[in-house]
């Protein structure tokens, strides 16, 4: 079970790493995929700074946790994804829901669930 969780958490880390690199090096394409509209140079700079910070931080700590089978680093992506999902619920409450609202929520919830299972699977001690 632990080895399976290491692989799955590694895949979560890799996915987030690729998304982070996408925002860093091709923010225009990522803006389209994430339904974003950056305003001018500052908007592009924000996409190159804030989004990679979120995704790459989550990715790196997921990969560290997976590599070491250590649950402590998993707290970082768990917190990031939990706050992202919370933000989506706040957005639904304040702005309403669009047909595109649910799929990213499902992905985030699945990653939270997977990371939570890995957190339990990896136990208190690193290998």
Model features per residue range: what roles?
Residues 67, 86-102:
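Membrane-helix boundary connector in multi-pass membrane proteins
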Residues 102-114:
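Small-residue-rich transmembrane alpha-helices that serve as helix-helix interface/gating elements
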């Amino acid at each position: 079970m632990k080895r399976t969780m290491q692989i799955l958490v590694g895949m979560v880390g890799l996915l987030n790493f690729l998304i982070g690199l996408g925002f860093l090096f091709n923010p225009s394409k990522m803006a389209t995929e994430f339904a974003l509209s950056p305003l001018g140079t500052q908007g592009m700079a924000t996409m190159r700074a804030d989004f990679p910070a979120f995704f790459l931080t989550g990715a790196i700590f997921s990969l560290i946790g997976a590599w070491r089978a250590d649950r402590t680093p998993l707290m970082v992506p768990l917190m990031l994804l939990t706050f992202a999902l919370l933000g989506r619920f706040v957005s639904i409450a304040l702005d309403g829901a669009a047909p595109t609202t649910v799929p990213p929520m499902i992905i985030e919830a699945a990653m939270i669930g997977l990371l939570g299972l890995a957190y339990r699977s990896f136990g208190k001690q690193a290998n």
